Amino acid sequence: MKQIFPPSITGKGSGGLGSGHASVLDHSFGKSDPYTLGVEEEYMLLDPETWDLVQHIDSVLAAAEDGEHHERIHAELMQSVLEVTTPVCRTAADVMRSLSQLRSYVAELARSEGCRVGSAGTHPFSLFERQRITARDRYRQLVDQLQYIARRELIFGMHMHVAVDDPEKAIQVMNGLLVHLPQMLALSASSPFWRGEPTGLASSRQMVFAAFPRSGPPPRFKDYADYAEVVGQLERTGCIADYTHIWWDIRPHPRLGTIEMRVCDAVTRLEDVVAITAFFQAIVKMYCELHESGKEIPTWHRLLTTENKWLAARYGLEAPIMDLATGRRNRVPVAQLVRRTLRDVEPHARELGSERELEGVREILARGNGSDRQLRVWNANRDIVEVVREISIATEAAAVSESAAN
């Protein structure tokens, strides 16, 4: 049988993938005000009786066409997934306002189409075999390329962008941020179930997405030219259509002029989303200022940062990880390193006006992450349907708050 390769594999054009994104070699690094923010969230569309996923994205998008936030709502690979994107925000408080409005809006839209929404890294019991691929060229071609790997990608993430005003700085800051991937993952982990089974992992989403090519922690780059050369080689040879088909846990986004943190599971509670976003923004600012002062940002071998990330995916906030900054011989709880980072970034959070939102990170450490909450519900009665119901109620709590405010 003759194998038919899509255009982006043969190098004969982009094949439609990544349309709207120029090559990393074709334009300068985007300019945005430093430390401005953007957040993307992926939500489940749920049947309110069975709490299984429903394939309602087209009807929800159609209902949103004339709405005030319709440009902020998008389809994803599966028809049971809805994505929202905030506008550019200056502060974590702006993110809170924007996502509160968006969660309220999509919850209302979903109800109008007979479904509900939920935010977590995986749906606890839905099966990827029962999902339909969204009828868009980008997604069809993605499945053509990745086959089973793409078809089983029934996972949900939360991505955060922070603007950096210089590409060289962005690369060095990204290198420094690798050591913080376990902290970000442990705070956001919300996928302890997969296909109806408790996995023993705080984030089973990480293991599903690890099958994707060009995923996981990125390598360390010497400078922006090093990054552009590597990505340009992939583009020139047709391995990828553009740089957005590099799915690292953290990556530069040249068109937007941002660093994008992608390691996080979708987060259920809005307050936790905002806290983690404030944490990320403050860390970026800390490393930017370290770079501007002429000091070297510390980095570590990819094997070590990848091992720490695995431990965070396995154990969540209880993960015993290597303290790479001090080199101590014994592993320490990731929560201890989160607290140390909080102390380091608090002055930066004050300057950013996000000190109050940053306190939410300590609240996550005190009461647990999304994975912990799901397991508490599960352990109470072994009812996995109730786990999904709780996810939806907690996700839509932002909608209730927004309605009360109005």
Residue ranges and their predicted role:
Residues 136-156, 220:
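Acidic, His- and aromatic-enriched active-site or binding-groove loops in soluble protein domains
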